[in-house]
Each structure stands twice: as C-alpha cells, then as structure tokens.
Amino acid sequence: MKQLALSLIFAFPFVVFGQERNEIIQQRVEFIAEQTESEDIDLTNIFDQLNYYYDRPINLNNTDAEELRSLGLLTDVQISDVFLHIKQFGKFISIYELQSLKYWDLATIQLVLPFVSVDDRFDQMHISFKEAMKNGKFELYTRYQNVRPLKAGYQSVPDSILNTSNSYYHGNDGRYYSRFRYTYRTNISVGLTGEKDSGEEFFKGSQKNGFDFYSAHAFYKGGKYLKSVAVGDYLVQIGQGLNVFSGYAFGKTPDIFTSKRTSNLLRPYTSVDENRFFRGGAAVLGYKNFTWLNFYSQKRIDGAGVADSLSDDLEFITTIDASGLHRTNSEIAKKNQIGERVYGSYLAYQTTRLSVGVAHVQQSYSSPLVKDTVPYNIYAFRGTTAASTSMDYNFVLRNVNFFGEVSYNSTNKSFAQLYGVMAALDPRVSISLIHRNYDKDYYTFYNNGFSEGSNTQNERGTFLGAKVRLNSAWTINTYADYFSFPWMKYLVDAPSKGNEFLFQPVYKPNKVLEIYARYRQQLRQKNSRDNDGTVTAIEDVVQRNYRFNLSYKVSEAITVKSRLEYVSIHRESNAPEDGWVFSQDIVIRPKSSPFDLSLRYALFDTDSYDTRIYTFENNALYVFSAPSYYYQGSRAYILLRYSFLRHCDLWVRYGTYIYADRTSLSSGAEEITGNRKTDLTVQFRVTF
C-alpha cells in the first residue's frame, strides 16, 4: 500500500491541493442564490457546515457515509468508492490515494481536498470538560446594516398617525445582528443568536426585550447509543424532503448532483430565518445498524384571522405570514398569533450502501386554517391537524445510486412521490434522473422536496441532467426538466405546464483560469394580460438567459472576474422585453497581509422588473447577498476585511446604486426619493 501511495505522488504531481475556502464556499452559495432568486437569504447553516470542516477536515480513515454526505460535495457513488478502497487496500496512507478512486476526477478532488484529511488517529469517544474547554472554539459576532437615503416609512410622524397607519415603521432603519457560539469539533454546539430587521423597534414599544428574534440551542453528537441530542432550536431533515426537511435545500443548479436531497437528520439551528426550524427537543438513538429519531417542537408563528373573544388564540386562521418582519402596526399585530406543534419519529436501517427509513409526523395549529375560497385555493390545506407517514430509501449498487421517498398525508388522503437514479456511466460521464408526482391536495408543514414550484404540492415532473468531462480542461453540465401543475396556481387560472433547459460548458485548463458560458431557457404558463374580464386565458412565457463568465487569477493574491449576462422574455400578450448586466470584480487576498479587498463595478439596462437579473455579491461572513439588477444604472461596492490581534476580524462594505432612468425608487413605505441608494455593512468577529 505504501508503494501505491508513493507511486501516486510521483505519477500525479500536478494535483492542486485545494482551492481557497472563500472561493469554494462562494461557488456553493452562488448556486443557491441564483436558484432562490431572493435578495435576502440566510444560508448560515449550509455555510457553517463547510466552514467547520475547513477548519477541522474530515478524517477519511475515521468517518461514515452520513458525515461525508453532509459536505454536500460528493455523490453516494463517490462516497461508496471511499469505503470500497479502505476495504480492499486498508486505511488511507496519503491523501494522494484519492486519485486512485474510480469515480473521483481531479475536479472533485480539488473541490473536496480542503475539507478532508488522512490520519491514523481516531477521535476519542469520551470527552472531558477540560478537553472541551481547552480545544473548543468560541465565536462572537456583531453586525450593523442600513440603506440610505431613508425610506418613506421612516419619516417622523405624530404618535396618533404612527399608531393607526400602516405606512410608517415603528423602529429605525438599522439592522442589528449578534451571535455567540461555542463548538467542540462536531460533538458539541451551544449558541445564542439575536436579530432586528430594519424598521423594527429595539428595547422599546413592541420589542422591549431588544431583538425581535432570538434563537438558542444546545447540541451534542458522538455517543455510541445516544448519537445526538438537541435542545432549543434545531433542524430535522429526512429522506428527500417530502415529509419533513426544515432549513434550506438545493434546487436545480448546473451541478446536477444537488438535485438529490442530502439529509443530515438532526442539526443545530444557527440561522435567522424566523420560520423553517423546530423549537423544543430531539434525540437520535442508535443500535448496530439501526437509527431512531424522536423530536418535539412547539412555538408561535405569525399570522392573521378572526379573533376568539374567549381565548388568546384566533377563532380561525386566514393567513400565515412567513416574512419575519414586524415594522408596521399590521405586521406587529400578526406576530406570534398562531401556536404550532410538530412531533414525530423516524426509524432507519443503515449500512454503507443501503439506507431504508420510515417516518411519522404529526402537525397541528392552535386554530383551524381556513384560506380564501378563491379557485386556486380549493385544494389548499384546511383544518387544524395534518398527519403524514413516509418511507425513504437510498441504495448504491456498483456505480448506480437509487433513491426516493413516498409520503402519505392521512388527513387529506393524498400522496407525494419521488424516485431518482444517479449513475456514473463512466468516470467521465454522470447522469441524474428524477421523477416526482405530488398530489394537488398534499400538504405537510415542513416539506421541501425537489420541485419547480415553491411547495411539494400540485406538481408532476421529470428531471434529467448530465455532467460530461470531455478531458482535463473541458466539462459540460446540462439538464432538462419537464413539469405540469394539475390544478390552478396563484396568477395561473388553469392547469398548466412548462419546461426548463440548461447547457453550460466550462473550460478550466489550469488553476488560474476558468471560463464558462451558460444558456438557460424557462417556459412557464401564466395568465394572459389580454382578457375580457370574465375568462382569463393562460399563455406561454419564455425566458432565455445567456451568460459568459471569466475568472482569472493574476497572481496568488489577485483574482479578476468578468461577467456578461443577457435576458429576454417573450409572451403573446406583451411586446418582447430584454436586459443585460455587465460586472467586473477584483478580489485581492494577500496571504501575508491582514487585509482582504473585494471590488465590483457593474452596468445594467433592463426593460422592466420582469427582466431583472440576480447576481451574487461578496459580503461579510454569514451575510448572503443576491440582489436583482433592473432598469438602467450602475452598481458598485467595496468590501474590506481586516484581521488583527490574531483573534479579531472586521468587515466593512459600502455599496451604491445609481439609476439613469428613475427619479424615485420603489413605492409605499419603501419609497426612496431620488435616483441613488447606498448600503452599508459593518461586522466584527472575535474568536478564541
């Protein structure tokens, strides 16, 4: 075995030992930002996972399939390759041995290297208090953000108007964030997070306790029989997300392997999304190949309805508000109006190649949910309680990974089904095939299955993707997705269908240059803008995006990135619209300097908001920016990071928009007078 390791070292001297942590994490986050098309997303939990493994890489000689899956960078076939290698040749002696794995190409190795290691020492099962305090990691973050000029909602008005109108915000324009967290390896995590959104009060009025949102957790992992336990806020992720999958999951991206859900079963919650998490307690027990999860959650969520004169709860609920914003009178009135209780159990049998599990989840609101009786809501969930039972599987047979889940809602007597196959047809060719069928009346509170729509409901579709590595420099990523919606949707007053195609060739001849082009076409059916007021016809809406992206590493310290993107939209009832964005980035990260610098200048010109283009932006650690550029104008920002006193970091980012065709921005309480808008982020971190 040692001879094999040595021969690999000399045979493959060109392997690049990893990319910069920020570059790798940005690539993953950028995929998510593009898919969500949201300007304000919180991906802390995903970032935490990669960030942790960068600081403390996974020991390939002392790991399991679940831990490797949690990276989100490997397929199950590639994970199976690791354990097959150990079975045939023994423990890894050198990290270079990864090149001998059949389904690990150089791109995969370079992507994963910063997060894995080879060591013959094993982590100890027993953790002493002294060891935990000595080698644990403490982190403290504090952050301030604002946007100027002040929006209309921040005008100073008399209390008589402020307390009766929904046009003004009760708090100032600052957005505050603080977070404390202690971690010891992946075994222990204790944290407290607080956040105030812009416009919310702080230590006064409706927020006398300071932050509008608090989140706390205590988490332990590592016992033989008590595998993990969580108290406070946590995430539960089971199977392919048809029954329960709290937190965020990837959707369709150029990386076809992200179409499969990677479930982490039980994790601490560290984000500030005020909805998609559980609050209570959970534990995972293990015996031999069996894993048993039990969890209970009870919390208050936002919503509105008809008040009950005999209790604090609503008589019935008409809307559930997931914005997490409490700035105006109406938003404050919705806060914590609904009681939510979720509990469940999951039993799984797991080996290196096989996993089969069964879950049952019971979910209830404090009052019946009764949505508006508009046609598209006919099959929406109504009532107080929903119960669902699911079965999921994951099986690796040689170079093929079979996976899927079937979930049954006994309340509505409806099903959600997903079946998938990922196969490495050749070390250079991989495919992903997924078929889903979600009944129009299927409903669970925390589903998050692979879908075109925003819910795991009212959808049928088939996704086929491929990744082809032509040679060491060229890679092709492509997919096609055909889908239909058996019933109406919001702004679609008839059953509809659509499709989506993506083709992305990537040229990366070495570690300093990467060029890719992307063509993406989306066809969706929406209500026609031409109607007689009685019957609304639907029409095809075709959007095409063309992108050219270049990244060049000028030196070890300097990277330049250029991007040009063009979008066009065609629909029968409207004239064609289009738009473009050109952005130029410079990133300076000298290894011997305490300073990092990121700069961007962008020009954009689009016909309307419909032709907006979302673009990832660098920001402070744990701040995720994906703003949309639309109308005519320019965008620029500068981000400076300063590391000092060994344990301290300071980030300062200042950005500005200048619009050439606007005299005011947005409307209502969000309106800004003038054609300029600036944003500021200041964040401080101390670790010890």
Which residue ranges define each predicted feature?
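Bacterial Sec-dependent N-terminal signal peptides
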Residues: 1-23, 688
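Alpha-helical interaction/regulatory segments in DNA maintenance proteins
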Residues: 20, 37-51, 88-89, 99-136, ...
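Amphipathic, charged-and-aliphatic alpha-helical interface segments
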Residues: 43-93, 112-117, 196, 200
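Transmembrane beta-strand segments of Gram-negative outer membrane beta-barrel proteins
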Residues: 127-164, 182, 186-192, 229, ...
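Exposed, low-structure sequence patches enriched in small/polar residues
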Residues: 169-173, 276-278, 333-373, 378-688
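Outer-membrane beta-barrel proteins
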Residues: 195-213, 267-274, 333-336, 407-409, ...
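Outer membrane beta-barrel
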Residues: 209-266, 270-302, 425-444, 593-609
